[in-house]
């Protein structure tokens, strides 16, 4: 007679399920982070050839890190948000880009390396602050200015200069 294994592996959940219905997570935080990292680089590698597939993969990473996972995993969400913003900009989906931008700004508390967060914001402002879409540009500049706690002095000044240039060009 075959001895019954008290654990049954369920492929779809990546969990070990005990015979009593309880479960044991197979992924540790490190394994989860490694999985997110692999997914991120897979999505990034297909971005040039298939924007729609890359959008799906980056969105999947973002959604996987929605809950209360460790802060180290939040970095992959942050990186995915930046990539999603780039794709939506390419596709001229400015409303979607703004939703992602707001979500990215709200990650300020979760990114341990504040220099990384702030330097990313500088690059984002440089990239999208040159848009020819005045409606988008105004919203884009105003959003972080409405939350000055996200900004250091350099970013605050950079955004205000962008705002002045925008207003000057508007007249």
What do these predicted ranges mean?
Residues 1-171:
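Extended alpha-helical scaffold regions
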């Amino acid at each position: 007679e075959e001895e019954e294994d008290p654990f049954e592996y369920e492929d779809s959940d990546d969990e070990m399920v005990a015979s009593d219905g309880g479960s044991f997570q197979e992924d540790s935080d490190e394994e989860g982070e490694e999985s997110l990292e692999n997914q991120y680089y897979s999505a990034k590698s297909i971005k040039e050839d298939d924007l729609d597939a890359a959008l799906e993969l980056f969105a999947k990473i973002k959604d996987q890190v929605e809950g209360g996972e460790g802060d180290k995993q939040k970095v992959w969400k942050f990186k995915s948000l930046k990539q999603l913003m780039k794709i939506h900009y390419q596709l001229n989906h400015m409303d979607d880009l703004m939703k992602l931008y707001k979500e990215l700004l709200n990650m300020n508390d979760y990114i341990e390396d504040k220099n990384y967060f702030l330097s990313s914001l500088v690059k984002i402002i440089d990239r999208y602050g040159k848009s020819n879409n005045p409606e988008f540009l105004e919203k884009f500049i105003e959003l972080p200015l409405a939350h000055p706690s996200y900004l250091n002095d350099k970013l605050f000044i950079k955004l205000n200069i962008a705002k002045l240039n925008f207003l000057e060009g508007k007249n």
